[in-house]
Swiss-Prot record:
Substrate binds at S55, D142, N154. The gene is proB. Its main location: cytoplasm. Keywords: Amino-acid biosynthesis, ATP-binding, Cytoplasm, Kinase, Nucleotide-binding, Proline biosynthesis, Transferase. This is Glutamate 5-kinase. Its EC number is 2.7.2.11.
Length: 373
C-alpha cells in the first residue's frame, strides 16, 4: 500500500521542525541540513516537486543574541526571528548549492491565506517558482505576526501549505521515529505505529505535549496537521528527520516512520480553506433539530434553527456553528450579518424579506459554504 501511494506522488510539502534543524543551543545543524538537501535533490531528480516548510529562524537567531532557552517575550522571539531568518536561508542556500538547486524565501501570516485574493496570488507564486525548478522555503513571518494572524506552529502551517500548493503528500520530519501508542520519551516500551487509517480522539489524548525546547509544536500539533491534510485527501508521512537517509529510504520502498491515510470523504480545497484557514468572527448557536440536519444530511442552515448569535460580524464572514451545549459542529460563511441574523432567527425563510425589507437568500449559511466538523 505504502509504495503504491508514494509512487504516485508528484508534489510534496516537507515540514522540518526546529528539533531537527538545530543542535540544541548551538545553532543550526548544517551537516544534517546538507543530508536533507541531498535527499530532496534525489526527489527532484525523480521528477517530483518539493516545497519546504521550515522552522528554525528563532532558534538560529537566539544563539546570535545570546538568549538561553526559548525567548521569554514576544519582542525577544521576533528579534530572534529577524536575525535568524537570514541565517536560516543562507544555510539552505549553502546546503542546496552543491546540487545546483536554487531556493526562495516565502514568509506568510494567516491573513495572507485567509484573504482569498492573496491566497490565490501565493499559489500562483509557488507554481511559478516550481516551474523554474526553484525549491520554495516557507516559514511564518514571526517578526511581524501577532496572535490574531499567527498560525500558532509550523505543523499547522505545513498542512495549510499542502492545500495552498495543491500537493499530494505532506512529510513531517521530526525528532522521533514516528507516531507511538504512548510517549517514547517517558515510556521506553512504547510501540511505533507504522500505519494510521484514522486519527481518533484516543490518539489525540495520548499525544502529549511539546517535544523539544527549541520548537513550539508537539505530537498534538503534528496529529492535527495530518488530520487537516487528510481532510482534502492528502496522506501524511511522519519520519525521524535526524536520520540522514530516512527520507530517501522511505521513497525507496522501506516502511519507516508512520503513514497517515487520508479520510474516505475529503473536503474540496475551498471548503478546507473555510474550515482551517479562515479565523471565525463569531458564533451561531443552533437548536437540536438544526444540529441533526446539518450533521447528518448536509443541509443549509436556515434561520428557523438558530437560537442566538454571539459576536459581531458582517455578511460573508466565517463563523462557528455550535450546539446549545457549546460544541462546535460546523464552520461557514454567512449570508447575513450578526444584526440581521439576530432579527430573523427563529423565523421561517419566507418571512425574511418582511422582517428586513430585503432578502439575500433563504439560508443563513448555504451548504456550499458550510463545513461540518
Amino acid at each position: 500500500m505504502r509504495s503504491g501511494i508514494l509512487s504516485k506522488v508528484k508534489r510534496i510539502v516537507i515540514k522540518i521542525g526546529s528539533g531537527v534543524l538545530t543542535c540544541g543551543d548551538n545553532g543550526l545543524n548544517k551537516p544534517l541540513m546538507g543530508s536533507i538537501a541531498a535527499q530532496v535533490a534525489e526527489l527532484r531528480a525523480s521528477g517530483r516537486q518539493v516545497i519546504i516548510v521550515s522552522s528554525g529562524a528563532v532558534a538560529a537567531g537566539r544563539k546570535e543574541l545570546g538568549i538561553d532557552g526559548r525567548p521569554r517575550s514576544i519582542p525577544q522571539k521576533q528579534a530572534a526571528a529577524a536575525i535568524g531568518q537570514s541565517r536560516l536561508m543562507h544555510a539552505y542556500e549553502e546546503a542546496f548549492e552543491p546540487f545546483g538547486h536554487k531556493v526562495a524565501q516565502i514568509l506568510l501570516t494567516r491573513d495572507d491565506l485567509a484573504h482569498r485574493g492573496r491566497f490565490l496570488n501565493a499559489r500562483a507564486t509557488l507554481d511559478t517558482l516550481l516551474s523554474f525548478g526553484v525549491i520554495p522555503i516557507i516559514n511564518e513571518n514571526d517578526t511581524v505576526v501577532f496572535d490574531e494572524i499567527k498560525f500558532g506552529d509550523n505543523d499547522s502551517l505545513s498542512a495549510l501549505v499542502t492545500n495552498l500548493a495543491e500537493a499530494n503528500l505532506l512529510v513531517i520530519l521530526t525528532d522521533i521515529d514516528g507516531f507511538y501508542e504512548a510517549n517514547p520519551r517517558t515510556n521506553p516500551d512504547a510501540r511505533l505505529i507504522p500505519l494510521v487509517r484514522q486519527i481518533t480522539r484516543e490518539m489525540e489524548r495520548a499525544a502529549g505535549g511539546s517535544g523539544s525546547t527549541v520548537g513550539t509544536g508537539g505530537m498534538v500539533t503534528k496529529l492535527a496537521a495530518a488530520k487537516k491534510a487528510g481532510q482534502f485527501g492528502v496522506p501524511t508521512l511522519m519520519l525521524n528527520g535526524r536520520n540522514p537517509s530516512l527520507l530517501a529510504e522511505a521513497f525507496a520502498g522501506r516502511e519507516v516512520g508512520t503513514l497517515f491515510l487520508p479520510g474516505k470523504e475529503s473536503l474540496n480545497r475551498r471548503k478546507h480553506w473555510i474550515a482551517h484557514t479562515l479565523r471565525p468572527s463569531g458564533k451561531i448557536i443552533v437548536d437540536d433539530g438544526a444540529r441533526t440536519v446539518l450533521a447528518r444530511q448536509g443541509k443549509s442552515l436556515l434561520p428557523s434553527g438558530v437560537v442566538r448569535v454571539e459576536g459581531k460580524f458582517d455578511r460573508g464572514a466565517c463563523v462557528r456553528v455550535c450546539g446549545t451545549d457549546g460544541t462546535e459542529i460546523a464552520r461557514g460563511l454567512v449570508d447575513y450579518s450578526h444584526d440581521e441574523i439576530t432579527r430573523i432567527l427563529g423565523h421561517r425563510s419566507g418571512e425574511i424579506e418582511a422582517i428586513l425589507g430585503y432578502k439575500y437568500g433563504d439560508e443563513i449559511i448555504h451548504r456550499d459554504n458550510l463545513v461540518v466538523l
